[in-house]
Curated annotation (Swiss-Prot):
Residues 604-626 are annotated as: Disordered. One of its GO terms (molecular function) is ATP-dependent protein folding chaperone. This is Chaperone protein DnaK 2. Induction: By stress conditions e.g. heat shock. HAMAP family: DnaK. The modification Phosphothreonine is found at residue 199. Signal peptide: none annotated.
């Protein structure tokens, strides 16, 4: 059996590792480096370059050199963040037929997974050269806050690269594996702060060690899938462009070659300022005008850089607080803090993390290699080479379906350990309803439309019956990769329909982290919306039951009472169309009072039919414990 390799597919750099005996070996690439730039260059001669060779030719070929493609995976073209990237990136970002964001190189549209596959091929070849054998299987890491479509797209990239992706695992979890494997110190709770090239994640992980066996359980995760070193670079680039314009009166943003040189210089300056107090950005012949060539020579201090990015560093604190809250832990309960990702080397980042947790982060974890090392350990678990490790990861956002009134009914809560399979039973909202639409959503808001639609499908062929009678079992199944499968089954007929969330219908990066922020900021609005929907659903149930009782009462109902009831019904139906909960509740009460005679008739009939052979439950308004949906929830007693 061949080796399963571990790959950290990063925004800025990628890394590959393998289990070599009892230890992890990070593998050097053909250039002798332990990390490879996630850069792909397409030359005029038709050659595809990956890593340092692509980076070296990027200045002269900016339009056909792709980087930070990980930020486009699973994203829609219309997304605000995509539009912002269009202004920043020197290469073309275009709209695919399915609405996704793709890139354009030499007139050809390419999907992000295809581009990422080139980096994975390089990682695969690097491992094969070291091992001396063909590699066909891999464990690939993704940001903890990646959604279903992004995870699926990452698996697609692996397949394009000729790899069977045995497992997708979260980057902070992988880093914790690398950190915790050699620790024989009993139980610990660690915080993994992962600030990489394009994404930020925080995970709170409990490591239990007993007799050499380790259990890694993720207690909570949070993050921002559009915050990383690339954004820090862009802040510095914008500052340098503004300073040059102030000094020389020329705008460099319209010159792709100049901007590519500036990007490299800004990245280099940022790294230098992690150890030095100031550096020079010196770019001779950066551009030219009628008077001759222009040169850039700008001093940048560490203090200046910190002032440019301070708000982004502070922005990482809210996810930290939320993760601790979700894990039900105080800062004092964190035993160790692990920093992962190249951007975490910045002194301001380290100081911010130290101040927040009240302790220095660990220095014995390599920020660039820990994630790939953890992936290699997980690969060893899957191949059977490592037997004393159990990894329990979580899903970052809640998953559910849209139910009647536009409510999102959660089936799986955020931070649920995966893999997991959970079911709820729903029913129809109308008499003789032959089909239901299962609309799958992801997010934390009560209002389904405020969350993100992942997909929908129809379950047809339901046998005609009164509303609330059919039982539709909806099952959410999240596999170990965090990818969602949804099934709806009619318990009576056995008919079933399934959906697997595909990359074309996934969430955008900005939308994912915005959902949780919105849920917190709009808690009051959500509560009011939920109350309004409850009032509407109770009113709908009352209207349905009353009309049925009027029909059954027939001539026994005096015309005067019938007119009162019809008037009250009309007023309540109008009220339900509005957004005033108090009015809906008042009109519901008015209908109940107008229906007093109707209730007397119904009770008299019930008593008359109380013989055993005719005993049946009268059709009543929906009980309080039933959720009216596009369906109506039937809660099983288990």
């Amino acid at each position: 059996m061949g080796k399963i390799i571990g790959i950290d597919l990063g925004t800025t750099n990628s890394c590959v590792a393998v289990l070599d005996g009892d230890s992890v070996r990070v593998i050097e690439n053909a250039e002798g480096d332990r990390t490879t730039p996630s850069i792909i260059g397409y030359t005029a001669e038709g050659e595809t370059l990956v890593g340092q060779p692509a980076k070296r030719q990027s200045v002269t070929n900016p339009e056909n050199t792709l980087y930070a493609i990980k930020r486009l995976i699973g994203r829609r073209f219309e997304d605000k963040e995509t539009q912002r990237d269009i202004d920043i990136m020197p290469f073309g970002i275009v709209k695919a037929d399915n609405g996704d964001a793709w890139v354009q190189v030499k007139g050809e549209k390419i999907a992000p997974p295809q581009v990422s596959a080139e980096v994975l091929k390089k990682m695969k070849k690097t491992a094969e050269d070291f091992l001396g054998e063909t590699v066909t299987e891999a464990v690939i890491t993704v940001p903890a806050y990646f959604n279903d479509s992004q995870r699926q797209a990452t698996k697609d990239a692996g397949r394009i690269a000729g790899l069977e992706v045995k497992r997708i695992i979260n980057e902070p979890t992988a880093a914790a594996l690398a950190y915790g494997m050699d620790k024989q110190e009993g139980d610990k709770v660690v915080a993994v702060y992962d600030l990489g090239g394009g994404t930020f994640d925080i995970s709170i992980i409990e490591i239990d060690e007993m007799d050499g066996e380790h259990t890694f359980e993720v207690l909570a995760t949070n993050g921002d899938t559009h915050l990383g070193g690339e954004d820090f670079d862009n802040r510095l680039i914008n500052y340098l462009v503004a300073e040059f314009k102030k000094d020389q009166g020329m705008d460099l943003t319209s010159d792709p070659l100049a901007m590519q040189r500036l990007k490299e210089a800004a990245e280099k300056a940022k790294c230098e300022l992690s150890s030095a107090q100031q550096t020079d950005v010196n770019l001779p012949y950066i551009t030219a005008d009628g008077s001759g060539p222009k040169h850039m020579n700008i001093k940048v201090t560490r203090a200046k850089l910190e002032s440019l990015v301070e708000d982004m560093v502070k922005a990482t604190l809210e996810p930290l607080k939320q993760a601790l809250k979700d894990a039900d832990l105080s800062v004092s309960k964190i035993d160790d803090v692990i920093l992962v990702g190249g951007q975490s080397r910045m002194p301001l980042v380290q100081k911010t993390v130290t101040d927040f947790f009240g302790k220095e982060p660990r220095k014995d974890v390599n920020p660039d290699e820990a994630v790939a090392s953890g992936a290699a350990i997980q690969a060893g678990v899957l191949s059977g080479d490592v037997t004393d490790v159990l990894l329990l990861d979580v899903t970052p956002l809640s998953l559910g379906i849209e139910t009647m009134g536009g409510v999102m009914t959660k089936v799986i809560d955020k931070n649920t350990t995966i893999p997991t399979k959970q079911s709820q039973t729903f029913s129809t909202a109308d008499d003789n309803q032959a089909a239901v639409t299962v609309h799958v959503c992801q997010g934390e808001r009560k209002q389904a439309s405020a969350n993100k639609s992942l997909g929908q499908f129809n379950l047809e062929g339901i046998e005609p019956a009164q509303r609330g009678t059919p039982q539709i079992e909806v099952t959410f199944d999240i596999d170990a990769d965090g990818i969602l499968h949804v099934t709806a089954k009619d318990k009576n007929t056995g008919k079933e329909q399934k959906i697997t969330i595909k990359a074309s219908s996934g969430l955008s990066d900005e939308e994912v982290e915005q959902m949780v922020r919105d849920a917190e900021a709009n808690a009051d609005a959500d509560a009011k919306f939920e109350e309004l929907v409850t009032a509407r659903n109770q009113a709908d149930g009352m209207i349905h039951a009353t009309r049925k009782q009027v029909e059954e009462a027939g001539e026994e109902l005096p015309s005067e009472d019938k007119e009162k009831i019809e008037a009250a019904l009309t007023e309540l139906e109008e009220a339900v169309k509005g957004d005033d909960k108090e009015v809906i509740e008042a009109k519901t009460q008015a209908l109940m009072e107008a229906s007093a005679k109707l209730m007397e008739i119904a009770q008299a009939k019930e008593q008359a039919q109380s013989a055993p052979e005719g005993a049946q439950e009268a059709d009543a308004a929906p009980a309080d414990d039933v959720v009216d949906a596009e369906f109506e929830e039937v809660k099983d007693d288990k």
